[in-house]
């Protein structure tokens, strides 16, 4: 416990000061506008109704928040707009979005400075290839073959945002900035019942993307920080060997008595809680904890995580958010793939002199397949096909040129093939390609007010095949490979590319 408190105090000593004055700098809101809101003018901001705004008004907003009459209005009229007067500042929600984006940029500065201040001898070497999302799959393929159980964790999120503000106190010791953050969270809470309405939570995340990402990453970083510490400490807490004693309740007392009777007894270590073959992977609000221990060990980790969230973060998480599965008998959804470690039978012929033997053995294999139902659901949601996978036209794209239509369909198809190239079964990918190809033909036929049959007879099937086929040189693992996206044929090899650094546009490239 003393080590834990010392470790925590060491982190508190890294707190950063003087964040709040940066909120009054003009360039902060220029950055927020350019990068957070995808605008074009850094100083003057154009709203949705083409009315011009200046980021100077945002600084006035901060000053006005701390005026007495403004605070009185916030308390006496909680349902009214408490940020700005519409007659003066037009849209308060727009300015609150600007200010939240600017605040997110400011509070990210201390974390960036911490990385820059890291000594060179302690820096982790940065390999460009390790940035790829696919780089994790060769690791899983190498490690999961030797593991037994897997815990699939849905990382809980605190429903009360005050917990997130308190977590920032470990990293940022700036009272005005924390008060400003509380103001925004309370504003959205009272304005649209943020705490109780899931719809309001989604609205807050949509309107304040950068701030929500920062709060979530801070929370996950805090929980993983102490989780890593406790994991390391558990490996340094050897328990005495208990093979002689069946009753663990009186283990300590018996061991002391045993030591008195046999002074020369040498204690052995038992890695009871911590197995050296344990791996932790986090992705998209989920995490995987795999180990080679027994089912009892995994249940201990599950109870530990539930109690950890309850007593450290002060909120209850349901035990059903942690699923314990045996790797040999189950599959798990991981970053757009359905992965499993099945045991495949292998028949080996052994020849000894004049006699031959057939040896039937089983080998583990890390298998990854593409979830067809999920991907067809994405295509159906984007109106490329029906729910059953029947291709339809894309009416909203009929105003584009033929080249733009072909380019969009071809890019989506190439992205799907590129990301899901690690699938051991390519039949689903060819089915998706067929849907996109026919949907493209129907879109072009609808644009030219013709039928698909007439359109294909006039241009030929090779016309679409040309745009859905691309040869590209990709550095895959340690070799160069030419990938041909042909419509026919079968490819069973699995390829992991090292140039994929984003997942949203690849796993779900239609949104």
Curated annotation (Swiss-Prot):
One of its GO terms (molecular function) is RNA binding. This is Maturase K. GO terms for biological process: mRNA processing; RNA splicing; tRNA processing. Belongs to the intron maturase 2 family. MatK subfamily. It is found in: Plastid, Chloroplast. Keywords: Chloroplast, mRNA processing, Plastid, RNA-binding, tRNA processing. Usually encoded in the trnK tRNA gene intron. Probably assists in splicing its own and other chloroplast group II introns. It comes from the Eukaryota. GO terms for cellular component: chloroplast. The keyword Transcription does not apply. It holds the Pfam family Intron_maturas2. Its main location: plastid.
